[in-house]
A protein has these predicted regions:
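Nucleotidyltransferase catalytic core that binds NTPs
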Residues: 1-197
Length: 197
C-alpha cells in the first residue's frame, strides 16, 4: 500500500515581527485542513519590501523561532536564505517539491494578499504547485480571480494585528503586549528593534 502524502502548510512572510495573527492562521489551518505540519518560511530578501527598512534576517529568524517554540508541529525553514537573492515563491516551491516529493503543499495567505497577487512573479504558476488557502483579514477585498477559484477559505477569527502597526507602536513607545508572543516582545525590547524607522 503506498504511503499517504504528507500534508504541509507553508506560511511565508517577512515576519518583522511575527505576531499572534500569524500563529492563529497557522493553527487554524493545521486543525481545519488536518495538516501534518506548518512550515514557516521567512523571506530572505522580500521583493515587495524593496526600498523599505527591514530587520536583518538573523533578527527575524530568531523572533520566529521564539514565536513557535513549544509547538512540535510548527517548523521554521531557512530555504530562502540558502537560495539567496530575492525571495520569490515561484522559485522556492520547486525546491521544496524536489526535496519532499511525497508532499501535498498548502500555501497559506491572508486575504490582504489578494490585492497584491498581480504584482507577484508568476502567480498562476505558484498556485499550480500548491493549494491556495486564504485566511480572512479585517477590511480586505475577498474576491478571487477566476484562476484562483480552487482556493480554500479558513474560518479563522479576523484579528486586526499587523507587523506595520506593531513596529509603529514600538516606535511610539506604546505597548504591544498580548498582540505578540511574550518571548518575541522581550527580544524586541532587548535588541532595541523598531525604535527608529
Amino acid at each position: 500500500m503506498p504511503k499517504a502524502r504528507t500534508k504541509i502548510g507553508l506560511l511565508g512572510g517577512t515576519f518583522d515581527p511575527p505576531h499572534l495573527a500569524h500563529l492563529v492562521l497557522a493553527q487554524t489551518a493545521l486543525d481545519e485542513l488536518k495538516l501534518d505540519e506548518i512550515w514557516f518560511i521567512p523571506a530572505f530578501r522580500p521583493p515587495h519590501k524593496r526600498g523599505e527598512r527591514v530587520s536583518s534576517f538573523a533578527h527575524r529568524l530568531a523572533m520566529l523561532r521564539l514565536a513557535i517554540r513549544g509547538n512540535k508541529r510548527f517548523k521554521v525553514l531557512t530555504i530562502e536564505k540558502e537560495k539567496g537573492g530575492l525571495s520569490y515563491t515561484v522559485e522556492t516551491l520547486p525546491l521544496l517539491r524536489r526535496k519532499h516529493p511525497n508532499t501535498h503543499f498548502f500555501l497559506l495567505l491572508g486575504s490582504d494578499n489578494l490585492a497584491e497577487l498581480s504584482s507577484w512573479k508568476e502567480p498562476e504558476k505558484v498556485f499550480s504547485m500548491a493549494q491556495p488557502v486564504f485566511a480572512h483579514r479585517p477590511r480586505t477585498e475577498e474576491t478571487l480571480p477566476t484562476w484562483l477559484e480552487h482556493a480554500v477559505w479558513l474560518s479563522n477569527p479576523r484579528l486586526e494585528i499587523s507587523a506595520t502597526d506593531l513596529r509603529a507602536r514600538v516606535r511610539a513607545g506604546r505597548t504591544i503586549r498580548y498582540l505578540i508572543p511574550e518571548t518575541v516582545e522581550l527580544y524586541i525590547r532587548k535588541k532595541g528593534l523598531y525604535r527608529r524607522e
